[in-house]
Amino acid sequence: MTARGNLFIVSAPSGAGKSSLISALLQDKPADKQVSVSHTTRQPRPGEVNGQHYHFVTKEEFKALITENAFFEWAEVFGNYYGTSRKVIEQTLTDGIDVFLDIDWQGAQQVKKVMPEAIGIFILPPSRTELEKRLTGRGQDSKEVIASRMAQAASEISHYNEYDFIIINDDFDTALADLVAIIRSQRLTDTGQIHAHNDMIQGLLAD
């Protein structure tokens, strides 16, 4: 019997290393885990591919999807809309694949209302100075955008206690090991093990 996949919510202030950690995690045994590809109205960044990094849509298209109740969760962030497909998430979990939602605290609250068993992981930078350094080093945003992200960071970080796990991304390898440990621990819960190994367990209990 295939165990149902786990839904992981991963949030962090922009520049904390969330996307890099998820990307590194998915390189190991990618068949049993995947990141949800969100819909967004923001413009693609250099190197981003439609359908791979995001489903890029217009605001009119996004609002139509909201009306159709097509999103598991959605939120407006920095003037752009982001949303997660309800149908895709449910089918992927049913197939026994862990799904990672790369979303902010607003989206996390919506998901928890629909699926309380979702596991929340919040990633923190070691300091505000390091966070600003990382944002600047990415070379993706203007000084104005970076200033806006730094101003928003404190508000985002204030929701850290709404999550089940907290990872400090000071050393990348250590943070990745912590993330792997969280994923593994959820696979080893009694519910997960019963679904995955029910026949074996019943055999052990047989007279």
Swiss-Prot record:
UniProt KW rRNA-binding keyword: no
Reactions it catalyzes: GMP + ATP = GDP + ADP
EC number of this enzyme: 2.7.4.8
Occurrences of domain Guanylate kinase-like (ranges): 5-184
Parts of the chain that traverse the membrane: none
Binding site for ATP: 12-19
Top EC category: transferase
SMART domains recorded: GuKc
Domain of life: Bacteria
Chief localisation class: cytoplasm
Protein task: Essential for recycling GMP and indirectly, cGMP.
Similarity remark: Belongs to the guanylate kinase family.
Protein name (record): Guanylate kinase
Annotated organism of origin: Shewanella violacea (strain JCM 10179 / CIP 106290 / LMG 19151 / DSS12)
Lineage, broadest ranks: Bacteria, Pseudomonadati, Pseudomonadota, Gammaproteobacteria, Alteromonadales
